[in-house]
Amino acid sequence: MNIMSDVRVRFCPSPTGTPHVGMVRTALFNWAHARHTGGKLIFRIEDTDAARDSEESYQAIIDSLKWLGMDWDEGVIVGGPHEPYRQSQRMDIYKDVLEKLKEAGFVYPAYSTAQEVEERHKAAGRDPKLGYDNYDRTLTDEQIAAFEAEGRQPVWRLRMPERDWKWNDLVRGEIEFKSSTQPDYVVARSNGAPLYTLVNPVDDALMGITHVLRGEDLLPSTPRQLALYEALKVIGVAQQTPEFGHLPFVMGEGNKKLSKRDPQSNLFNHRDAGIIPEGMLNYLALLGWSLAGEKDIFSVDELVENFDVTNVLANPARFDQKKLEAINADHIRLLEPKDFEQRLRAYLTEYTDFPTDYPAEKFAIAAELVQTRIKMLGDAYGLLSFLAIADEDLTLDEKSAKKNLKETAIPALDAGIAALEGVEEWTTPAIEAALHKALIEDLDLKPRVAFGALRVGISGQAVSPPLFESMELLGKESTLTRLRATREVTPYQVAAE
């Protein structure tokens, strides 16, 4: 279609397992194409495999789209003019289409077993693994009757036109498959149950899908779908053949596709670690597409404004965890402080044991201290947890203590404690001034030596939010209690030693 607003794309996952980042990337590109063109996104569910499909997986797909902020115009939950949008509820539609294909001669019954096909290949000197040989398309009535008398139940195969197949792929340009590579294929089982090879194009046809954007693994099946569309148009089911675009593989480590067994493939692992939706969407978009000018950080609005499926790269895209985290860090920094504070509080409440009763005014300050220091929301827990525990529950990280609480740290701790005891107005500027005078000016210590021991003393870690601000948040009593306890174990020694 030429009118951009007539664009209709679909996202049609199978509800098996947990949402894979490759699947979600496919959803994103379809969503971005629909939003960029002013078209519509149709969301339906391919749940015809009763043995593997589950309601839990279906809900997980819904949750993944909602978390990322991707909406749809027609489909499950929201409804639309082509209901139902779950294939398991459309079986009567598929059976009706199958009967029309039978009546028009586009499909035929095939009785050959896999063993018989292999034996015919061997007898002809061909590779026995070549696949179906189209033998049954010319069966006589007598042969069919004989098979029926044996009790055989046929599968139904689409009669593939004997010609080469060419089309202009939106991502890969001109594609050609030779006729010899496209045998007649099964569209319905021997029990009459329609297969994916039939139901998916039928749904696309009846729902007026104009662009099929899907994974590269489905590229070899395109000639079959083109042939089926020709038949569907003849019997009045399809009005047009959609354009196809095959999106690049998402690769994992090395040269392998990102497997479902790889933890990085699970979208929810990233959410649970503290990747925010803006960071995830930005990174997923980069798995095959990029904004002009090599700009890696962009908003959802910028993605929608600039997305062009013809600019998607055909080469495989490698999933890079470090790059995802770096992009996420940038998006965390772009959040308004109040927005970040609310998201961080919600995250820590859901995924950690950070106290829900920690004072709101203190949490707002703490959040501001870590917003520019974390890559994922989950990083904040390790930086902030020391603020919310009892002084006696603080434990020193062994590596940090061994490095920062040596004999040379004793003067810094003694002088620091003495200086802080004299601070009357417990504010960040007053704390900083007192410690700077006592440690840097009076003792002539380098800041790393002067403040390293104090940092470990109040937080248990060598890395924490800014020292003076952290002391203000802890309060004078807790700060001094922790530093005195640290002084008692300095120089620090591992118990086993």
From Swiss-Prot:
Gene3D superfamilies: 1.10.10.350, Glutamate-tRNA synthetase, class I, anticodon-binding domain 1, HUPs. ATP binds at K260. A motif ('KMSKS' region) lies at residues 257-261. It is an enzyme of class 6 (ligase). It is found in: Cytoplasm. A motif ('HIGH' region) lies at residues 13-23. Its EC number is 6.1.1.17. It holds the Pfam family tRNA-synt_1c. One of its GO terms (cellular component) is cytosol. GO terms for biological process: glutamyl-tRNA aminoacylation. It catalyses: tRNA(Glu) + L-glutamate + ATP = L-glutamyl-tRNA(Glu) + AMP + diphosphate. InterPro entries: aa-tRNA-synth_I_cd-bd, aa-tRNA-synth_I_codon-bd_sub2, aa_tRNA-synth_I_cd-bd_sf, Glu-tRNA-ligase_bac/mito, Glu-tRNA-synth_I_codon-bd_sub1, Glu/Gln-tRNA-synth, Glu/Gln-tRNA-synth_Ib_cat-dom, GluQ/Sye. Keywords: Aminoacyl-tRNA synthetase, ATP-binding, Cytoplasm, Ligase, Nucleotide-binding, Protein biosynthesis. GO terms for molecular function: ATP binding; glutamate-tRNA ligase activity; tRNA binding; zinc ion binding. Signal peptide: none annotated. Monomer. Catalyzes the attachment of glutamate to tRNA(Glu) in a two-step reaction: glutamate is first activated by ATP to form Glu-AMP and then transferred to the acceptor end of tRNA(Glu). Belongs to the class-I aminoacyl-tRNA synthetase family. Glutamate--tRNA ligase type 1 subfamily. This is Glutamate--tRNA ligase. The gene is gltX.
